Amino acid sequence: YKKCRPNHFVAAPTNILQIIDAMQGKSMSHCITLAGGGESMTPQQEEKVNTYLAKHGSSAKYITGYGMTEFAATVTTGLNNVYRENTLGIPLCKTIVKIVDTETGKELPYGEVGELCFHTLSQMKEYYQNPKETAETIRQHEDGMKWIHTGDLGWVDQDGFVHFKGRMKRIYMT
């Protein structure tokens, strides 16, 4: 990172924190975008990163998003001036987010914690030769649409920003 000085950098929060620590006061004026994903960052860690960037010549703010292989891409982001600290950003175009009760499957109102579910044009059709996991992950709701159940907990605030609370389960499928 010190040698190449990238303008746009995306990494896991753990790696971003390691880089900030390793920079030892060096300029970050080259940094236009600093984005993370794959795990959460505490508000204190996010503040540490943003303070370092500001003190060392960058106008960038740490941004995050949410995505899974099952979507083939990111489905929420804080880019393009829709940044809000400690959120996953807002859903991308043609992406719908729904928070559902983990017991009943019913949609929850703004501010209530439940399972993050998404419907997007880029979502997968199925897991290869794994109909059981497909049925658990992709579910048709009362609205007739097929939704990806992420296994993650979160909520949506009144402004449409998605918040991450934690994981219901951890899956490593290879």
Where are these regions (language model features)?
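Gly/Ser/Thr-rich phosphate-binding loop
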Residues: 6-11, 20-87, 96
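Alpha-helix capping/helix-boundary segments
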Residues: 14-16, 41, 123
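Short coil-to-beta-strand transition motifs
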Residues: 89-94, 148
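Generic short beta-strand
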Residues: 97-98, 153
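Conserved ATP-binding/catalytic segment of the ANL
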Residues: 109-111, 117-174
